[in-house]
From Swiss-Prot:
Organism: Human papillomavirus 3
HAMAP family according to UniProt: PPV_L2
Description of post-translational modifications: Highly phosphorylated.
Molecular function terms, GO-annotated: DNA binding; structural molecule activity
Any one GO cellular component localisation term in the record: host cell nucleus
Positions of disulphide bridges: 21-27
Name of the protein in its database record: Minor capsid protein L2
GO biological process: microtubule-dependent intracellular transport of viral material towards nucleus; symbiont entry into host cell; viral penetration into host nucleus
């Protein structure tokens, strides 16, 4: 086994040894000279200081602070202090006032007589002319008594509705404001005016004129979110909860009262055991959603900020992640057939009399008569049925028809009289022919207007023009 060496203890300093061994006399030979300053170096400095004065420079084994007085600048004169005394104010002369003196001091001095001065000398002589003065010796006295002060009187009225009886209220008069009466003088004469024509500022142009005082050159567009740069990680989310409840993918908290259309901020990232979806690990902030179009699809996007690490200074570092989910593809535009909302007007008045039937151009109609009898029994006619075969492109359809019968014309009422005399005579009931319309005639022609109708209108029902025949109802 390897023996462990004892840890080496630090030796005491010379100052610590000097405190304990000086009294006992057991100090090493190099401790006492070092502490007391009697080494060879200290002695050389002491001997050299006897011939060279180095005082005040701090050269030696001292602390180097320049001695007690410190360092002084070289070749400088000490500054002198100038004593500036403040002059004393002159004393105020106090004049004593006796009990008999008035206590009111007039601001204006008493008026005095103004001397007119010396008289004008008179010169007399033979030569020249004589000057005679008309001046008087009466002195002029000026009355400088101060005029009386002007007194300005103003009145102000304050109306308080709380202390004013409603029946005493008066309508305020014109020109009265806060108790001061204002008097205005109407202007006299007529004043002319100048008619200034109005100018039109908006004039028709080419459409390229600027609409502001400082037009912005070019087209300014709002920059969209930079979601597909190299610094943003792209993550596709397939969970439908990302559209309605994105918070449920990052935490198990209750999102009932949390708005999902705004930025979601977490105080701190959740641990991996608390995140339902691993793609949303270390998410600190999830920005508001945005709808964009990408390669023919509608895309729902959110940008998230992760907090992967934190420095000692407290700054967080993390990547930006773009979470997206494609909603639906954008299909091509469908062509919608436009239909008129107003029905077209009729071409003519006779179009409203026709009914729409099958196209006679595409059908072959053949009539087969099984027989015809005009037997009358007690005033009633026996009608034999006819059949019609309609051949169309969809198949043969048999339609039953009723052939017309000949109705004999008789004068008088519709009562059949017996051929032989029979008594008593019992009249028969009238012939019942109200079920069908019978047309009896040898030939007929179409209405002349039908020859001018176009082909597409021939499918309508047209009226008949009888050449020779009768109609019985």
């Amino acid at each position: 086994m390897v023996a462990h060496r004892a840890r080496r203890r630090k030796r005491a300093s010379a100052t610590q040894l000097y405190r304990t061994c000086k009294a006992a006399g057991t100090c090493p030979p190099d401790v006492i000279p070092k502490v007391e300053g009697t080494t060879l170096a200290d002695r050389i400095l002491q001997w050299g200081s006897l011939g060279v004065y180095l005082g005040g420079l701090g050269i030696g084994t001292g602390s180097g602070t320049g001695g007690r007085t410190g360092y002084a600048p070289i070749s400088t004169r000490p500054g002198t202090v100038v004593d500036v005394s403040v002059p004393a104010k002159p004393p105020v002369v106090i004049e004593p006032v006796g009990p008999s003196d008035p206590s009111i001091v007039n601001l204006l001095e008493d008026s005095s007589i103004i001397n007119s001065g010396s008289t004008i000398p008179t010169f007399t002589g033979t030569d020249g002319f004589e000057v005679i003065s008309s001046a008087t010796t009466t002195p002029a006295v000026l009355d400088i008594t101060p005029a009386s002060d002007n007194v300005v009187v103003s009145s102000t009225n304050f109306s308080n509705p709380a202390f004013t009886e409603p029946s005493l209220l008066e309508v305020p008069q014109n020109g009265e404001v806060s108790g001061h009466i204002l008097i205005s003088t109407p202007t006299s004469g007529t004043h002319g005016y100048e008619e200034i024509p109005m100018e039109t500022f908006a004039s028709p142009g080419t459409g390229t004129e600027p609409i502001s005082s400082t037009p912005v050159p070019g087209v300014s567009r709002i920059a969209g979110p930079r979601l597909y740069s190299k610094a943003v990680t792209q993550v596709k989310v397939t969970d439908p909860a990302f559209l309605t409840r994105p918070r449920s993918l990052m935490t198990f908290d209750n999102p009932v009262f949390e708005p999902e259309d705004e930025t979601i901020i977490f105080e701190r990232p959740y641990s991996p055991s608390q995140v339902p979806d691993s793609d949303f690990l270390d998410i600190l902030r999830l920005h508001r959603p945005a709808l964009t179009s990408r390669r023919g699809t509608v895309r729902y996007s959110r940008v998230g900020q992760k907090l992967s690490m934190r420095t000692r200074s407290g700054k967080g570092l993390g990547a930006r992640v773009h979470y997206y989910q494609d909603l639906s593809p954008i299909g091509p535009t469908e062509d919608i057939e436009m239909e008129p909302l107003i029905a077209p007007a009729s071409a003519s008045a006779y179009d409203s009399l026709y009914d729409v039937y099958a196209d006679v151009d595409d059908a072959d109609i053949g009539f087969t008569s099984g027989g015809r009898s005009d037997t009358l029994s007690r005033g009633r006619a026996t009608v034999s049925p006819l059949s019609s075969t309609l051949s169309t492109k969809y198949g043969n359809v048999t339609i039953p028809f009723v052939s017309p019968v000949d109705v004999p014309l008789q004068p008088g009422p519709d009562i059949l009289l017996p051929a032989s005399a029979q008594w008593p005579f019992v009249p028969l009931s009238p012939v019942d022919t109200t079920h069908y319309v019978y047309i009896d005639g040898g030939d007929f022609y179409l209405w002349p207007v039908t020859f001018f109708l176009p082909r597409r209108r021939r499918r309508k029902r047209v009226s008949y023009f009888l050449a020779d025949g009768t109609v019985a109802l």
